[in-house]
Amino acid sequence: MVASNQSEVNIGMVGHVDHGKTSLTRKLTGVWTDTHSEELKRGISIRLGYADCEIKKCESCNEPECYTVDKKCDCCSGKVETLRKISFVDAPGHETLMATMLSGASLMDGAILVIAASEECPQPQTKEHLMALDALGVKNILIVQNKIDLVTEEQAVENYEQIQKFTKGTVAEKAPIIPVSAHHGANLDVLLKAIQEFIPTPKRDETVSPRLYVARSFDVNKPGSEIKDLKGGVIGGSIIQGILKVGDEIEIRPGSKVVEGNKTKWVPIITKIISLGAGSKKLKTALPGGLIGVGTELDPNLTKSDALSGSLAGIPGTLPETLEKITIRPQLLERVVGSQDELLIEPLKTNEVLMLNVGTSTTVGVTVSAKAEKVEIKLKLPVCADSGDRVAISRKIGSRWRLIGYGIIL
């Protein structure tokens, strides 16, 4: 079964701030993903941005010139055939927004690490983003050496060698390095060919109970709308397994926070799928892969301003329990990356405050007990997760949260 309107793979666009991730996404998709007023004002990505593109190929022309995202071949203006539709997840590169990048990494089947040829490599967040991909198990990586139009050939070669040295011994050691100018659209055909070769569509199991990682949630109603015209809340994210259909009843966990006296509990939300969409296309059935919007019967107050981002959605009764405490087996990095002085990472201690990313969820927790092989953490915001899931671990160093490793939930 093929949903031709839907992307089949999610590719993260990651790297240091201002290295050209959003510009490259726009060149490939035609969509400028910095759409929030604060982002436009500051010129940086603050939230995760999403955009789709279709990789097409002309049968008449030679490789790599035959690859394009346009309706006609760039070389001969001839007919093109669509090979695959992909979704890009544009992650913020600013160090203060690392939590957003980590929550986006759980949606990524592969990643493009964008490195500007016009700056020394590696820059702090170039390092931190590569470590994050490694920590969260993203293995299919391409490197784009961007802004080659701003440097001489000698500088480009020197930067290329710096990239090779930086990636040696990392998950990106064998990643192709593709020189590109996003501004001029140079070498995009080579990049598209590499995406086809090095970031395959993962095998998905469509027969099991569906699970949707929720990365965004919205109220799509305009202020002053008539009551009869109001639409239910919308959640956006990616199905990691199974299939969702219009009309399905779904459960969203952890759900709503309910305070009774001195006690707080989390109650799962049950709702019905009213509509499914991928980009501007409507779907009746949504498959794993790509980013989708799910229209629901929920009160829009529950979904506005990303209130449900970090949740897990699925068929009622099939989701993991909501956890207010987790036990993990930690795997710490040797040194702190992303800061100028790369300090040695000390073992986790009891009563330490940590930031954790589980799926698309970001939460803070306090270690209740800390041993080398087993750490128990009480969470401020609960998560819905299974044993075996990966958790990114960050520690506050100075005034910033820094990635220090990952853990596996026991």
UniProtKB/Swiss-Prot annotation:
Region (G3): 90-93
Protein's organism: Methanococcus vannielii (strain ATCC 35089 / DSM 1224 / JCM 13029 / OCM 148 / SB)
GO MF annotation terms: GTP binding; GTPase activity; metal ion binding; translation elongation factor activity; translation initiation factor activity; tRNA binding
Keyword Protein biosynthesis annotated: yes
Gene from which this protein is expressed: eif2g
Domain tr-type G: 6-203
Named cofactor requirement(s): Mg(2+)
Region (G2): 43-47
Protein's UniProt name: Translation initiation factor 2 subunit gamma
